[in-house]
């Protein structure tokens, strides 16, 4: 199977929106996805790569610089998804390798990824690529009415 990993373009928004909805269960409008993608593509602190197969985007990884006052600079994987029809073909691994490449290019000390506790297939991939288990945390969120 031939696929290519390339930098994301604005015209990839619909495919990313579909992956977010179908593979990760996020209900976020296409218009909002286009708006945020348009901003992130020009933000040097963020990078988005897509996996393309026969002209169709079948996966993506969104990474961002992660800097703290108490640890060295890392790259944080903000989102990674591969179409269920294309999973277990090496695409997720290739996307992670691309993220690691960018991390090294910008002088980051490593890559950080948080993953839902039910995503055992993803956990197996991360472990197979040398990612160690971090500490268990709870994720709190407070949304504001706009």
Task: Give the ranges of each region predicted by the language model.
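Acetyl-CoA-dependent GNAT
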Residues: 3, 7-11, 17-73, 78, ...
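Short hydrophobic/aromatic beta-strand or adjacent loop that forms the aromatic wall/cage
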Residues: 46, 135-139
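Short coil/turn segments at alpha/beta junctions that flank glycine-rich nucleotide-binding fingerprints
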Residues: 73, 89, 105-109
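A short, internal acetyl-CoA/4′-phosphopantetheine-binding micro-motif in the GNAT/acyltransferase core
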Residues: 80-87
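Conserved acetyl-CoA-binding loop-helix of GNAT-fold acetyltransferases
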Residues: 88-101, 128
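Conserved active-site alpha-helix within GNAT-family acetyltransferase domains
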Residues: 93, 105, 117-136
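Conserved GNAT acetyl-CoA-binding A-motif
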Residues: 96, 103-115
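Terminal substrate-recognition subdomain of acyl/acetyltransferases
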Residues: 138-146
């Amino acid at each position: 199977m031939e696929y290519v990993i390339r930098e994301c373009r604005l015209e990839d928004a619909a495919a990313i929106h579909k992956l977010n909805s179908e593979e990760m269960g996020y209900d976020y409008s296409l218009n909002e996805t286009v708006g945020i993608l348009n901003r992130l593509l020009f933000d040097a602190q963020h990078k988005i790569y897509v996996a393309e197969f026969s002209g169709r985007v079948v996966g993506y990884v969104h990474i961002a610089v992660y800097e703290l006052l108490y640890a060295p600079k890392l790259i944080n994987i903000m989102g990674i998804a591969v179409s269920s029809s294309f999973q277990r073909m090496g695409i997720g691994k290739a996307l992670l390798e691309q993220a690691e490449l960018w991390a090294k290019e910008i002088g980051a000390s490593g890559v950080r990824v948080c993953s839902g506790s039910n995503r055992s297939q993803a956990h197996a991939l991360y472990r197979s690529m040398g990612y160690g288990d971090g500490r268990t945390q709870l994720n709190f969120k407070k949304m504001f009415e706009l």
